[in-house]
Amino acid sequence: MKEVRGEMWELAPQYDAVCITTNGFVKSNGEAVMGRGCAKQAARKWPKLPAVLGERIKTRGVYCAQLLRTSGFTLFSFPVKPGSVIVAQDKSNIVRHMRKKFAPGQTAPGWAAVADLSIIEESARQMKLWIDSKPEYKTCILPRPGCGAGELTWEQVKPVLEKHLDDRFTVVTY
């Protein structure tokens, strides 16, 4: 796994596959919540993307999914959060700015959860399988999964990714 600094969308055309970090929550209108980070940026670039991701989540669950092809790369979801979570007694599984809105034991939407290392690991495993099985995908770029709105540290996430991602994968830090 390689690491670079830069702006992901400027670097994206140099890669065959681009991953955006996502959660598994789907709104009542069928659209996925894409309200932060690179997911929000992608939803602004491709306005139909929340509906596409919402449909993928509804039909396949919280898995890596091919979302769209551009002239330069294929865009994939890279889940880091579940569809929903039961709020822990100490609320430690809810992002800090949302803790006042939920009570322990309540079900909170996945977008309000702290990123989940087991979901990140499964996403890394799935993306490696995608890249392994499709010869047209030789390189893949993704942000540090779970390290922005997911409130994990890179020190927590990096060892999980290193178990699965080889040098075809580049993690970008902005």
Language-model segment annotations:
Residues 1-174:
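Macrodomain-like recognition of ADP-ribose-binding/processing modules
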